[in-house]
């Protein structure tokens, strides 16, 4: 069986699956965004299952709310990010993962080093400092750990599987509206109920 690479960026631009509208606080979109971005940081690809504390992940305003207060609670301006990437990005601008495929911009080699494939990739790496030695080391440690676990699928699932607490979006506080209601059926929770969710991603 071929297992997914832990640091493979998406080969296509992200297409929003969900579209809840009308929450009074942007934090209420958290579980929608967890599902939207597959429980990992959109920038560095670190997964929830690799970090243990809820506060390790935040909701990043892609267009900074300090400069664009009108979209502070706009779901389509929010992405799921680890606290380190969110803090480093701050109010800086990056190529949108919905406009460009990050997999066409960035590549992580087997030694954990990240490479820019174009100018967008150079910008992402520079702004987020993704080529810092500690990032390279962390990626290498995880790549080697995953490689060493390929004969132990149950343990490997802890690293490459989905988190246990998949959000049931139908049970979330109902938003005022949802411009993509069909996305709930395609959520990871619903797919698991239908036995359509793969073991690894």
Protein language model features and the residues they cover:
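Short cysteine-rich loop/turn motifs with clustered Cys
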Residues: 29-56, 82-85
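Short, Lys/Arg-enriched charge-dense amphipathic segments
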Residues: 72-84, 112-123
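Alpha-helical interaction segments
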Residues: 13-19, 52, 96, 149, ...
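Conserved, surface-exposed functional patches that form binding/active-site neighborhoods
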Residues: 89-161
């Amino acid at each position: 069986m071929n297992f997914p690479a832990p640091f493979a960026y998406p080969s296509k631009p992200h297409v929003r699956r969900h579209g809840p509208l009308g929450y009074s606080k942007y934090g209420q979109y958290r579980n929608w965004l967890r599902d939207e971005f597959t429980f990992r940081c959109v920038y560095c690809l670190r997964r929830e299952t690799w970090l243990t504390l809820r506060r390790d992940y935040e909701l990043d305003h892609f267009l900074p709310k300090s400069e664009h207060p009108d979209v502070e609670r706009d779901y389509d301006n929010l992405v799921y990010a680890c606290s380190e990437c969110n803090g480093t990005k701050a109010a800086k601008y990056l190529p949108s993962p919905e406009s460009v495929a990050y997999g066409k911009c960035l590549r992580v080699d087997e030694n954990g080093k990240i490479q820019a494939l174009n100018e967008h990739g150079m910008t992402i790496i520079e702004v987020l400092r993704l080529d810092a030695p500690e990032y390279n080391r962390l990626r290498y440690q995880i790549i080697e750990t995953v490689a060493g676990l390929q004969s132990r699928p149950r343990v490997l699932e802890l690293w490459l599987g989905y988190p246990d607490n998949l959000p049931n979006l139908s049970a979330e506080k109902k938003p005022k509206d949802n411009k993509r209601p069909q996305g709930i059926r395609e959520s990871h929770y619903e797919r698991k109920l239908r036995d359509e969710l793969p073991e690894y991603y």
